[in-house]
Amino acid sequence: MSVQVQFRVNGKSYQSHVEPRLLLAHYLRDTLGLTGTHIGCETSICGACTVLLDGKAVKACTVLAVQASGSEVTTIEGLAATASPNGGLHPVQEGFWEKHGLQCGFCTPGMILASVELLGKSPNPTEMEIRQALSGNLCRCTGYQHIVEAVQHAAKEMKNRKPKSKNPNNSSAKR
């Protein structure tokens, strides 16, 4: 038995017939070839398989492809394209690069996508908010401090990149 699913993955539409119990992580990796969605524990503990599902960070090893049908999925492969059509990195990816927020890289895609969700909700998070938001993503290498610094760096970059208001009635404008 197969079920039809349809998604927008990294801005591109896909339609497939899948087995009803196929996990989103396996659909992304095996059907679409998007291997940046890592498989670590397959029990929702490590967070290596984190993707954005309609903008919310989810662990793709616990979401069935049929549950995600009709949704917009963003993987690590598509993140830069959403931020910079000319091939540049997303500010969170830049932060991980600049602040050495990765070592072996296995947890990195999940950490980055969980961080993107956090910064979408809280553009200026505290260190504790960052640690809490990433508590479902495990890293065996970095000790987390560089990851926290990477997210803080990204928050500053994202704030600096926002266009300034051109409204002359803006109360913060000099008079």
Task: Name each region found by the language model.
Residues 1-166, 173-175:
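Signature of N-terminal electron-transfer/Fe-S-associated modules in redox systems
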